[in-house]
Amino acid sequence: MNYLNENIDSLNKKLASGDLSADKLAKDTVANIKDTDKKLNAWITVVDDAKPAENLDFSKSKLAGIPIAIKDNIITNGIKTTAASHMLYNYMPMYDATVISKLKKAGATFVGKTNMDEFAMGSSTEHSYYGVTHNPWNLDKVPGGSSGGSAAAVAGGQVVAALGSDTGGSIRQPAAFNGIFGIKPTYGRVSRWGLIAFGSSLDQIGVMTKRVKDSAEVLNVIAGGDEHDSTVSTREVPDFTKFIGQDVKGLRVAVPKEYMEAVSGEMREVIQKQIDALKDAGAIINEVSLPHTKYVVPDYYIIASSEASSNLQRYDGIRYGYRAEDTKSLLDVYVKSRSEGFGAEVKRRIMLGSFALSAGSYDRFFRQAAKVRTLICNDFDKIFAENDVIVGPTTTEPAFDIGSEISDPIKMYNNDILTISANLAGIPAASVPAGLVDGMPVGLQVMAKRFDEGNVFKTADFIERTNKFYEKTPTGMED
């Protein structure tokens, strides 16, 4: 089953009419993954005997019988979950993350776990114990990260929907690189219980699909309160599909000058074309400034790395994770297990975070980063007082060549400069395909105030209906 020309609505109609059985859909999906993943390496684990739930009601749930991919840092009962790390190479969970429980209740079928940067730390899916994932548009390019496997699986037609996680752009950047839609909801909109922690004040589970409406369908299911997660909001979740097909006339759209200045001329033209389409449809375009944009990368990497160093303390060979052999002392167990279990990028961030939290550095680094984070939040509050959404490029460039940036951590970190702010501020943000530059997709980022995913969906859906990018086929998947 190839999903390049399918969506949740089309599959639901076939399942409801009896033209397609959920069992056949699951089997065909697994067969197609095994065939096409020779090119992509988008998966860490494929469930060979994936079976749909029994007594599915296709009229009550659009997700009934729909195969969904899950990023490998989201806990799945009975399906290996590794976070793409040697540290967890044989971890078999005994419970489900809350989002998985909700999807099961909706009747979704789980066909496997997708590749990612180890512990979600990276922007290219090159930092994986299971090898690099390839971009379906050009197999020599990265798919972005850290949710690169989920993005490639959707763009490559292996599934119609996938879950990812976003700590600094890990859904939106790969969505842009692969020409699909990806949304990071408001921090607290979706439960993080069962998400392997990276940066606890930044992490958020989200959705990646080819069509905007499909993400709305999935978010309808996974959003909402959870007694296991004290940071998740209990406010009522609207039907996000109601924002699909809406008029954008009168929508107040802010365009940050710092974002537009960060991209090349050709890429700027593609982004500007989408902004002009909004204007032609009656949206009100306002140029604005996010003056603290230049500080977001160092601010983020201090905060995120500090939280990561704390969260990853538990993986020591005693409490959790890989345990090294031939050790002679308890200290030897700790040192060898962590040295052998973690990859280079994870160790780099643990060291950075441990330094920022150390007694001599806490006030100079972490405390100052927290203050700058407040300034960044204030910038957004000021803009949303007079605007409904913020739009601009998702990334500063299209997907880059595999191996071209992995040896330069600073260059790799700067890939996140346009996406990080939304995580620091906790606001909803999405990337929707805007067009092609040098044959590779680029995305338009849409942001809104906290818990206003509705305007994000409304704006992104308008862009999708205008440019119909979903009709394009990734060139790397052509026979």
From Swiss-Prot:
For the biological process aspect of GO, one term held by this record is: translation
Which top-level group of life is the source organism from? Bacteria
Keywords from UniProt, A to Z, are: ATP-binding, Ligase, Nucleotide-binding, Protein biosynthesis
| InterPro entries registered for this protein in UniProt | Amidase (IPR000120), Amidase_CS (IPR020556), Amidase_dom (IPR023631), AS_sf (IPR036928), GatA (IPR004412)
The UniProt entry's GO CC annotations, sorted and at most eight, read: glutamyl-tRNA(Gln) amidotransferase complex
The catalysed reaction is: L-glutamyl-tRNA(Gln) + L-glutamine + ATP + H2O = L-glutaminyl-tRNA(Gln) + L-glutamate + ADP + phosphate + H(+)
The EC number(s) given in the record are 6.3.5.7
Where is the catalytic site? 71, 146, 170
Q: Name one GO molecular function term.
A: glutaminyl-tRNA synthase (glutamine-hydrolyzing) activity
Q: Do you know which NCBIfam families this protein is assigned to? A: gatA
Which HAMAP family does the entry link to? GatA (MF_00120)
Question: What does the UniProt function comment say about this protein?
Answer: Allows the formation of correctly charged Gln-tRNA(Gln) through the transamidation of misacylated Glu-tRNA(Gln) in organisms which lack glutaminyl-tRNA synthetase. The reaction takes place in the presence of glutamine and ATP through an activated gamma-phospho-Glu-tRNA(Gln).
Q: How does it assemble?
A: Heterotrimer of A, B and C subunits.
Which family is annotated? Answer: Belongs to the amidase family. GatA subfamily.
The protein's name in its UniProt record? Glutamyl-tRNA(Gln) amidotransferase subunit A
Q: Which gene encodes it?
A: gatA
